[in-house]
Curated annotation (Swiss-Prot):
<feature type="region of interest" description="Disordered">
    <location>
        <begin position="87"/>
        <end position="111"/>
    </location>
</feature>
<comment type="subunit">
    <text>The basal body constitutes a major portion of the flagellar organelle and consists of four rings (L,P,S, and M) mounted on a central rod.</text>
</comment>
<dbReference type="GO" id="GO:0003774">
    <property type="term" value="F:cytoskeletal motor activity"/>
</dbReference>
<keyword id="KW-0998">Cell outer membrane</keyword>
<dbReference type="GO" id="GO:0071973">
    <property type="term" value="P:bacterial-type flagellum-dependent cell motility"/>
</dbReference>
<keyword id="KW-0975">Bacterial flagellum</keyword>
<dbReference type="GO" id="GO:0009427">
    <property type="term" value="C:bacterial-type flagellum basal body, distal rod, L ring"/>
</dbReference>
<keyword id="KW-0732">Signal</keyword>
<comment type="similarity">
    <text>Belongs to the FlgH family.</text>
</comment>
<protein>
    <recommendedName>
        <fullName>Flagellar L-ring protein</fullName>
    </recommendedName>
</protein>
<feature type="signal peptide">
    <location>
        <begin position="1"/>
        <end position="21"/>
    </location>
</feature>
<dbReference type="InterPro" id="IPR000527">
    <property type="entry name" value="Flag_Lring"/>
</dbReference>
<keyword id="KW-0472">Membrane</keyword>
<comment type="function">
    <text>Assembles around the rod to form the L-ring and probably protects the motor/basal body from shearing forces during rotation.</text>
</comment>
<dbReference type="GO" id="GO:0009279">
    <property type="term" value="C:cell outer membrane"/>
</dbReference>
<dbReference type="Pfam" id="PF02107">
    <property type="entry name" value="FlgH"/>
</dbReference>
Length: 237
């Protein structure tokens, strides 16, 4: 009994691990070139007393756009994806036929050789008929998909690269009625693409990684159960 329970637990673990391995995910670690590129050095500036353009916490006249590590920037995510794909295959093959060997005839006067020829001809007198074979295969499939993602979140400048570009990362979690929504965004942006109100469109993100996930009972009901998914994945037919 214990052995059966143990084997059942092992089988359950294997099925669960196979199903988990098929779940897509995104690695939000910075690209290699971001790690390899030196950070831009910032030289602190001393405040000038009596100046309207000081570098204090809240200067009277200053650019409100993010410029340094840990500054915040608002990302307007507007992504649309659509795909339309179809395929068809029609395969037919047929085979069949017969084979007749040559006949042996002796035209001489020697009776012994004549009988030998008749004997050999009788042994060789056959027809080979190949059975007919017909194969038909027809298959096809189509897929049409359209997705729109419109959302706004704030991100933080993680690193200012030596050329002045920013590597940013943002994370947003919302919990409503037991349904948790998680949005993660990372990428490299140019300061010139930041608008005056300190916002940037997601289309300007290089090496962009955008992940939108729903967690909860409602989301689970729209997903295939892991046991069924694992069995279909391993099914050879």
């Amino acid at each position: 009994m214990k052995k059966a329970l143990y084997l059942g637990a092992v089988a359950f673990g294997v099925v669960f691990s196979m199903a988990s391995a098929n779940e897509p995910n995104i690695d939000f670690n910075p690209p290699n070139y971001v790690e390899e590129t030196p950070s831009k050095e910032f030289i602190p500036e001393l405040n000038k007393l009596g100046s309207l353009f000081g570098q204090g916490e809240r200067p009277l006249f200053a650019d409100r756009r993010a410029m340094k590590p840990n500054d915040l920037i608002t990302i307007v995510v507007s992504e649309k994806a659509s795909a339309n794909y179809s395929s068809s295959k029609d395969y037919k093959s047929a085979s069949g036929g017969n084979s007749t060997p040559p006949r042996l005839t002796y035209n001489g006067l020697d009776e012994r050789k004549k009988k030998e020829a008749e004997y050999l001809d009788d042994k060789n007198n056959y027809n080979f008929t190949k059975s007919s074979n017909n194969t038909n295969f027809k298959g096809g499939g189509s897929q049409k998909k359209s997705e729109d993602l419109e959302i706004v979140l704030s991100a933080r400048i993680i690193k200012v690269l030596e050329n002045g570009n920013y590597f940013i990362y943002g994370n947003k979690e919302v919990l409503v009625d037991g349904e948790k929504q998680i949005l993660k965004v990372s990428g490299v942006i140019r300061p010139y693409d930041i608008e005056r109100n300190n916002t940037i469109q997601s289309k300007f993100l290089a090496d962009a990684k955008i992940e939108y996930t729903n967690l909860g009972h409602l989301s689970d009901s729209n997903k295939k159960k892991f046991a069924a998914d694992a069995m279909e994945t391993q099914m050879p037919y």
